[in-house]
Amino acid sequence: MSRYAILGSTGNCGTALIENVLDSSMTEVHAFCRNQEKLERLVPRVISDARVKVFVGGIGDTETLAACLHGCNAVFLCITTNDNVPGCRVAQDTALGVVKVLERSRADGFLPMPKLVLLSSATIDDVLSRNTPWVLRSILLKSASHVYEDLRKTEILLRAEQDWLTTIFIKPGALSVDIQRGHALSLTDEDSPVSYLDLAAAMIEAVNDPQGRYDMRNVGVVNTHGRANFPSGTPLCIAVGLLSHFAPFLHPYLPSGTGPR
């Protein structure tokens, strides 16, 4: 039986991953989060489903993280933020924590290593974003500049470990809290907006590809049965993000949690 570790299991992507796994397979889920009550409120079925084991802690809690990753075939790195936080290190700290734990496992002889799946963004990829109007992409890059810089550094960090650790870099476009319509993976294109449920299904498909076609690749997600609804929180998120970019000293006074709805 397969086992997945989902880091950031209370976020939109994390909950969508749990829902997809529990709906479609007998795979076990190791859900890593800081607030178990929140997870149980968002995905009530985790309370009674024997396939789910919850690990409560922060990414710096090495022992809890090690227990969460133990025996897993795949690790989904979904700890992220929609707030353009100056000096953001969420993705880097997550990746560093995972690498540290897996290095110890490797030294102790626990092989093979799980495959990592990093949630990133098409906006920072020149190929996947080639059809995005220049003005729009420029606005998007600035509205999440601190988050995107964190993701760029995280990708460099993980690619530096590719001789022993495989990562898939999932880079969707705009995301929406919406129903699942159907998806396809692409190495050349993205489609916006995509629902979190379709994104999650795409991440699972990529990690399970028997030929490893997506290993160490930048992977886009396209819709196959129509786009998701426009995420209503996006305009405010962009506006607040731009303020954080041009006047980072204002960030503590700006609204938070303004991401997709």
UniProtKB/Swiss-Prot annotation:
The record's section on SUPFAM superfamilies has: NAD(P)-binding Rossmann-fold domains
Extract the GO molecular function terms from the UniProt entry: monooxygenase activity
Q: Which Pfam families match?
A: NAD_binding_10 (PF13460)
The EC code for this enzyme is 1.-.-.-
Protein's UniProt keywords contain Oxidoreductase: yes
Q: In which pathway does it act?
A: Secondary metabolite biosynthesis
Q: Which UniProt keywords apply?
A: Monooxygenase, Oxidoreductase
What role does it play?
Oxidoreductase; part of the gene cluster that mediates the biosynthesis of pestheic acid, a diphenyl ether which is a biosynthetic precursor of the unique chloropupukeananes. The biosynthesis initiates from condensation of acetate and malonate units catalyzed by the non-reducing PKS ptaA. As the ptaA protein is TE/CLC domain-deficient, hydrolysis and Claisen cyclization of the polyketide could be catalyzed by ptaB containing a beta-lactamase domain.
Concerning its family, UniProt says:
Belongs to the avfA family.
PANTHER family associated with the record: FLAVIN REDUCTASE-RELATED, OXIDOREDUCTASE MDPK
The protein in question is named Oxidoreductase ptaF
- Organism for this UniProt entry: Pestalotiopsis fici (strain W106-1 / CGMCC3.15140)
